[in-house]
Design a protein with these regions (language model features):
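Glycine- and aromatic-enriched alpha-helical transmembrane segments of multi-pass membrane proteins
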Residues: 142-170
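Functional transmembrane alpha-helices
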Residues: 4-141, 161
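Hydrophobic alpha-helical transmembrane segments and immediately flanking/interface helices
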Residues: 95, 170-171
């Protein structure tokens, strides 16, 4: 469902058709591509170790996989649009452009963003914190060098896009 909102926001930005919303749509599409790929990569990491996608079997991963927990947190926060990450820039510009066009439209879009943030943060809490109940997770290993070599550049891009968005907007 979060992917649906992140697909709808750039469409809103394109149809509002002012400079802020168009720039926001471009950044949001780029950010969404990177962050979604990173989140799927994070899911793949724990699936590779536990061989289940069922969320109820996860919990307490921060105790066994602290590097994974940090990487997953960064991508999750970028997905919900935390300032300083790539997700914030696109969402902010789209909402700003939508607000200039129609305040009600901007309000509904912002409400969707907030509801998505609640869902994503609950998901993060459920997977990362708590106690380990699945026996397969008792000896689970943290990120290896190969996984870090893939994840760290994605983290750098997500943060660079959030701090220096003009790099991606200037011709």
């Amino acid at each position: 469902y979060t992917l649906s909102l992140h697909d709808a926001l750039p469409i809103l930005g394109i149809f509002v058709a002012n400079q802020q919303s168009i720039e926001g749509a471009m950044i949001q599409m780029l950010s969404h591509g990177i962050v979604s790929a990173a989140l799927f990569l994070c899911v793949g990491v724990i699936y590779d170790r536990a061989h289940t996608r069922d969320i109820k079997f996860y919990g307490g991963l921060v105790n066994r996989m602290p590097h994974y927990a940090v990487a997953f947190m960064i991508f999750m926060l970028a997905s919900v649009g935390l300032p300083g990450t790539s997700g914030f820039v696109g969402e902010f510009l789209i909402i700003l452009g939508a607000f200039k066009f129609n305040t009600s439209l901007a309000f509904f879009a912002a409400t969707g963003i907030i509801l998505t943030a609640v869902y994503m943060l609950y998901l993060y809490k459920r997977i990362i914190f708590g106690i380990i109940t699945n026996e397969k997770l008792k000896n689970i290993l943290d990120l290896n060098r190969r996984e870090k070599a893939i994840i760290i550049p994605l983290i750098i891009v997500v943060i660079l896009m959030g701090i220096f968005p003009n790099i991606f907007l200037e011709p």
